[in-house]
Structures are given as structure tokens and as C-alpha cells.
């Protein structure tokens, strides 16, 4: 088994999903957000550069507007997300400030990273913020994103968005926090003998086929989108860890090399002269 070595990792993208930020009751998980802010601030104090990709706008919006479930109407979905995004960033700003860490907001649509001019601008924005010691908090701009064939601006979900952000910022590592322990050889909710894959070097058709199921009622990303995100990370010669976000402090353990979650890392070919 390959040993995980993250000593040389400087720039880290951390992605947290709605299911990790919102309790099953629909209320905001304040303890989880506080832990996340502590972990990221600790990493910043150690000289790391951290970008946070955060879902949760819809979950926050549903809570504020006291709605039981996400609307089926697109315009109402966008309205709820717009309300929730403000609340989410306000809370992040307050809690990160407790740890003397400044944050900023970057809202992206897919067309921004497709066109070279806008891609250059957003890349420069990331670099400027990082150089100032600020944590960029990234989300999709749900209020304006559309998924129409002639003008598709949606990423699909924040799993893919986090892989895109890791690529354009040339991050050393993407850490994806989810409500599952990692990638299993089969669905652990159905099969008791399902085994956690500690290391994945190649995304095979078998892995893609076994990654099924949708996300939670508050979020959208299922296992398939996480596997597809790992594929994007591989295409950018990067690495990714998919792990349970129940205890964000586990991120520090992962960076120490402890074998939590699933490590997606291609095996480098050895060339002989």
C-alpha cells in the first residue's frame, strides 16, 4: 500500500457539502462550522493556503424562510439560495473572525471558467486573496446559473466545482468532506460486507458503475459526482481525499498521513534511462 505523504502540500481546497453543514432537522450545524473554521485557521497559521468550496446556500435559505423542503420551481429555488448565501457568508465571516481569519466570497458560473479572459480574471482574484492571507469561500452562483443547452452555466454540483477550483488554482490537494467515510467497493447501506477503498490509483469502469445514488434532500451530490470529480483531479495531475466530514478536525489527521477516507492518487510511472 502506498504511504500517504502530505508534507509538501501547501495549497489545499476543502469542499464541504450541505449534509455536513445542515442538521437532519434542517437547522444549521453551528458546531461543525466552528470546527471547520478552527481547522482552516490552524492550517493557515502553519503556512498553508486554503480555499473553501462550500455548499449550503439552499439549506440556509430553507432554514431562514422556514420552508420544509426545496421548492420545485426554479425561480423559487434561486430565490431561496440567494437568501441562504448571504446568511451562510455572514455566519462564516463571524466564526472565522473568532480565529482571526479573514474570508472572502467568490461566486462562480461555468462560463466564467470556460472563457480565457474571465478565467484569467478569476485566477488572479484567487491568487491576490491567497497572497493577502484570506480564505476564499467559493460557491456556485445559484441565482443566475442555468442548465440550458444553448447557455449552460451550471457546474452540476459543488463536487465538480471543487475539482474545477482545485484545477484552476493548481492546488496540491483536494479534500472532500461528505456524509460517507469514502469510496466503498459496493454500497455500504445495502451490503454489510462492503469494504472501504483506502487508495484509488485508477478510475475504472467498475468504480464508475458501482458509484450510484443521489444526494440528500438538502444537497445534490451523490457518489458518482465524487468519482467524476476525482477523475477531473487526475486529469489535472492532482490528488484528492474523500472522507467523512462528521469531525472536521480529522482533516488535520489526514494531513499527518493517517489513512482516513479514500485517497485518490495516481501512481507515477518510473522511467528508466
Curated annotation (Swiss-Prot):
Q: What EC number(s) are associated with this protein in UniProt?
A: 2.7.2.11
Q: Identify which top EC class this enzyme belongs to.
A: transferase
The record's annotation in Pfam families points to:
AA_kinase
Give the residues the record marks as binding substrate.
55, 142, 158
Q: What is its main location?
A: cytoplasm
Q: Which residues bind ATP?
A: 15, 178-179, 220-226
Cellular compartments annotated: Cytoplasm
| Catalysed reaction, written as an equation | L-glutamate + ATP = L-glutamyl 5-phosphate + ADP
Q: Does the keyword Amino-acid biosynthesis apply?
A: yes
Record-level GO cellular component terms? cytosol
MF terms in GO: ATP binding; glutamate 5-kinase activity
UniProt keyword list: Amino-acid biosynthesis, ATP-binding, Cytoplasm, Kinase, Nucleotide-binding, Proline biosynthesis, Transferase
Which cysteine pairs are joined by S-S bonds? none
Q: Which GO terms describe its biological process?
A: L-proline biosynthetic process
User: Please, which domain of life does this record's source organism belong to?
Assistant: Bacteria
Q: In which pathway does it act?
A: Amino-acid biosynthesis; L-proline biosynthesis; L-glutamate 5-semialdehyde from L-glutamate: step 1/2
Q: State the similarity comment.
A: Belongs to the glutamate 5-kinase family.
NCBIfam families the record matches: proB
Q: What does this protein do?
A: Catalyzes the transfer of a phosphate group to glutamate to form L-glutamate 5-phosphate.
HAMAP family assigned to the protein according to its UniProt record, in alphabetical order:
ProB (MF_00456)
| Matching PANTHER family | GLUTAMATE 5-KINASE (PTHR43654), ISOPENTENYL PHOSPHATE KINASE (PTHR43654:SF1)
- The protein here is known as Glutamate 5-kinase
Q: Please tell me the species this chain comes from.
A: Streptococcus pyogenes serotype M6 (strain ATCC BAA-946 / MGAS10394)
Amino acid at each position: 500500500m502506498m504511504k500517504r505523504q502530505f508534507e509538501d502540500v501547501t495549497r489545499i481546497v476543502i469542499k464541504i457539502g450541505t449534509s455536513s453543514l445542515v442538521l437532519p432537522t434542517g437547522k444549521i450545524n453551528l458546531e461543525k462550522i466552528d470546527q471547520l473554521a478552527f481547522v482552516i485557521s490552524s492550517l493557515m497559521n502553519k503556512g498553508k493556503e486554503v480555499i473553501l468550496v462550500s455548499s449550503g446556500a439552499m439549506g440556509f435559505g430553507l432554514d431562514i424562510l422556514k420552508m420544509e423542503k426545496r421548492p420545485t420551481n426554479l425561480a423559487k429555488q434561486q430565490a431561496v439560495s440567494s437568501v441562504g448565501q448571504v446568511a451562510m457568508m455572514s455566519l462564516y465571516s463571524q466564526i472565522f473572525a473568532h480565529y482571526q481569519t479573514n474570508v472572502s466570497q467568490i461566486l462562480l458560473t461555468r462560463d466564467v471558467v470556460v472563457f480565457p479572459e474571465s478565467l484569467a480574471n478569476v485566477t488572479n482574484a484567487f491568487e491576490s486573496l491567497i497572497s493577502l492571507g484570506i480564505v476564499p469561500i467559493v460557491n456556485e452562483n445559484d441565482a443566475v446559473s442555468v442548465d440550458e443547452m444553448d447557455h449552460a452555466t451550471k457546474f452540476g454540483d459543488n463536487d465538480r466545482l471543487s475539482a474545477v477550483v482545485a484545477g484552476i488554482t493548481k492546488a496540491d490537494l483536494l479534500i472532500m468532506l461528505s456524509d460517507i467515510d469514502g469510496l466503498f467497493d459496493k454500497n455500504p447501506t445495502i451490503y454489510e460486507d462492503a469494504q472501504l477503498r483506502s487508495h484509488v490509483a485508477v478510475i475504472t469502469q467498475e468504480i464508475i458503475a458501482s458509484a450510484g445514488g443521489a444526494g440528500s434532500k438538502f444537497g445534490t451530490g451523490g457518489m458518482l459526482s465524487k468519482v467524476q470529480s476525482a477523475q477531473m483531479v487526475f486529469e489535472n495531475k492532482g490528488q484528492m481525499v474523500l472522507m467523512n466530514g462528521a469531525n472536521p478536525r480529522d482533516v488535520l489527521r489526514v494531513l499527518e498521513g493517517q489513512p482516513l477516507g479514500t485517497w485518490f492518487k495516481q501512481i507515477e510511472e518510473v522511467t528508466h534511462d
